């Protein structure tokens, strides 16, 4: 009798445990289903927002320019790093310049600059286009106004203007070229890591930070930078002419404030955008022709820049920068 009761009790306990196990499994399955649906709806919401931004954001915003009426001074912002896939890229700034020059109501153009510089290639493209457009539109002057900073590649661009203005405390100059990197020779050996590099040219990997620096390759790279620096100097002399002071420090990479830059002939006067529009161009009404990225463009640019920078790091690609 006792054994029968014990067996019955064990059987009931087993049923209870089985029921509890089934209940827990059902609960876990329900949680998994809920989690999956949560992920699905979150993904769907993200996709909806992404598509909405893509469909309803314009490819580029220049609405202010398109609605301008009457004579005006065109203003184009040059902000941040001057480089491809950046807001201050040659493509964006040249687009803005062409639209400003082609507008029949434009009486003058102000390039409002606040930039540390960047790519000599992008700066050169913009410089050349300003000079070309000035020849096509001889009655439309171009002025550069440096606000906080107009250094290196930014000054390269400013040199193409008819005149350059700055604030007393603006930082102007830094006419030089730099290319920086690091040397990690011996680091991998200490970590017990063997690095294998395969090239088809003797100097193909001369910028590899994990290889010892060779004197002949260092000299070669310095010659490249010196040649690029000379191109920069030639453009500044072409744009500024005899307004430049005879000062041996002018092209050494030093930077000066606005008052000092005026004495050195790097700028023509002290003033703001509104002052130039009012007192120099003679049309106080300003219209912004700056190319503005849409949120979608900004997202894709940042994504592309991130991927490109990663590839550049892995491939050991680092070009000269004028800043």
Sequence positions of predicted segments:
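Extracytoplasmic ligand-binding site segments that recognize negatively charged/polar headgroups
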Residues: 174
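N-terminal organellar transit peptides
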Residues: 1-167, 178-323
């Amino acid at each position: 009798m006792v054994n029968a009761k014990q067996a019955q009790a064990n059987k009931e306990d087993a049923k209870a445990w089985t029921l509890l196990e089934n209940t827990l499994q059902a609960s876990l399955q329900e949680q998994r289903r809920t989690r999956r649906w949560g992920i699905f709806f979150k993904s769907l919401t993200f996709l909806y927002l992404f598509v909405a931004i893509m469909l309803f954001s314009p490819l580029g915003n220049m609405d202010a320019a398109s609605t301008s009426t009457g004579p005006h001074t065109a203003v184009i912002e040059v902000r941040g790093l001057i480089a491809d896939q950046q807001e201050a890229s040659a493509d964006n700034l040249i687009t803005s310049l062409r639209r400003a020059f082609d507008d029949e109501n434009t009486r003058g153009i102000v390039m409002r600059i606040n930039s540390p510089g960047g790519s000599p290639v992008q700066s050169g493209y913009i410089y050349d286009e300003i000079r070309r457009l000035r020849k096509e539109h001889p009655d439309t002057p171009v002025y550069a106004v440096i606000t906080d900073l107009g250094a290196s590649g930014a000054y390269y661009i400013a040199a193409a203007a008819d005149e350059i203005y700055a604030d007393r405390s603006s930082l102007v100059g830094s006419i030089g070229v730099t290319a920086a990197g690091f040397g990690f020779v011996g680091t991998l050996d200490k970590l017990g890591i063997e690095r294998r590099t395969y090239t088809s040219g003797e100097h193909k990997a001369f910028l590899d930070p994990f290889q010892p620096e060779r004197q002949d390759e260092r000299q070669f790279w310095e010659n490249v930078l010196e040649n690029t620096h000379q191109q920069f100097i030639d453009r500044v002399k072409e744009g500024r002419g005899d307004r430049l002071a005879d000062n041996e420090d002018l092209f050494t990479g030093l930077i000066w404030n606005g008052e000092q830059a005026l004495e050195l002939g790097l700028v023509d006067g002290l003033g703001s955008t509104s002052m130039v529009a009012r007192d120099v161009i003679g049309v106080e009404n300003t219209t912004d022709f700056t190319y503005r990225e849409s949120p979608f463009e900004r997202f894709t640019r940042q994504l592309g820049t991130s991927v490109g920078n990663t590839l550049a790091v892995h491939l050991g690609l680092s070009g000269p920068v004028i800043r």
